[in-house]
Regions:
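Active-site-adjacent substrate-binding region
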Residues: 10, 130-233
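A non-catalytic alpha/beta surface segment that caps or lines the substrate-entry region
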Residues: 1-35
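Soluble periplasmic/extracytoplasmic beta-strand elements of cell-envelope proteins
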Residues: 32, 46-48, 89-91
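Acidic/histidine-rich catalytic neighborhood of metal-dependent amide-processing enzymes
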Residues: 27, 54-151, 155
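Solvent-exposed loop/turn segments at secondary-structure junctions
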Residues: 5-8, 39-40, 51-55, 94-99, ...
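Surface-exposed patches in mature extracellular/periplasmic domains of secreted proteins
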Residues: 1-6, 84-88, 166-175
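Loop/turn elements at helix/coil->beta-strand transitions in domains of secreted/extracellular proteins
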Residues: 41-45, 83-89, 113-118, 161-167, ...
Length: 233
């Protein structure tokens, strides 16, 4: 992969631009953890998050995407000794470099005939506007692109209500595939969805050097992780 170049003529949060032809190439690895199911091991539930922060700006990436990475790790930790009927895989990829390594992961899954029955992308959990943060709102949006993804978005609403988790949970249908879930949709897995703190994304520190741990609403991240785990099982 290559780091994105920085185009300072663009708005600060969107200064990424294609790398130059002579820019340095790096080897980026997709990291997997796999827990095989006890009854239906051929059916795979996938949780994924991009593990890298922005390559064109010196951002710590606390919301984007340390929150999604930590949430995915926590789900793996909680399921380590749980008897899962279906297999649960965890994928950590790169999305702030080019090309996205989730593209390779999705294409490999299609080539190998992996029976992915649910795909959950965790990205920038809890990231929201300052107004929402100051108001104490615990927000989560589930994005889906194809009709096959809507039931998984609705499931987030159901578990939020059943278990009284306390999220302000909404859903939104995108017009085209995007982010790492979009890599899987483009590879023929239309059920893929993404969880994010707000949409349109409203964190004022988005893609900035100020995306630091201190402003992160960790309680919001915890609640979104709980709901994602509950809906995944």
């Amino acid at each position: 992969v290559k780091a994105f170049s920085c185009d300072t003529s663009k708005p600060k949060a969107h200064q990424y631009s294609p790398p130059t032809a002579d820019s340095t190439e790096f080897t980026a690895y997709n990291l997997y953890a796999k827990k095989y199911g006890s009854q239906y091991p051929e059916e795979v539930i996938l949780f994924l998050a991009h593990k890298d922060s922005q390559s064109w700006v010196d951002s710590p990436g606390a919301y984007d995407n340390c929150t999604g990475t930590v949430a995915t790790m926590e789900i793996a930790h909680l399921l380590a000794n749980h008897n899962c009927k279906r297999s649960v895989w965890f994928l950590f990829c790169n999305e702030e470099h080019t090309p996205w390594t989730s593209i390779a992961a999705a294409q490999n899954a299609r080539i190998k005939g992996t029976n992915l029955i649910a795909i959950f992308n965790l990205d920038s959990l809890g990231g929201k506007s300052k107004q929402s943060l100051d108001s104490g709102l615990k927000t989560n949006v589930t994005l889906y692109t194809e009709p096959e993804g809507e039931p998984f978005a609705d499931l987030m609403t159901e578990v939020n209500e059943i278990y009284n988790i306390g999220l302000l949970q909404t859903k939104f249908m995108r017009q085209r595939p995007g982010d790492d879930d979009g890599s899987f949709i483009n590879a023929g897995f239309p059920m893929a969805v993404m969880n994010v703190g707000s949409y349109p994304y409203a964190d004022p520190n988005y893609h900035l050097e100020t995306d630091r741990p201190e402003p992160v609403d960790i309680e919001n991240v915890r609640l979104a992780t709980q709901a994602r785990l509950a809906s995944g099982l």
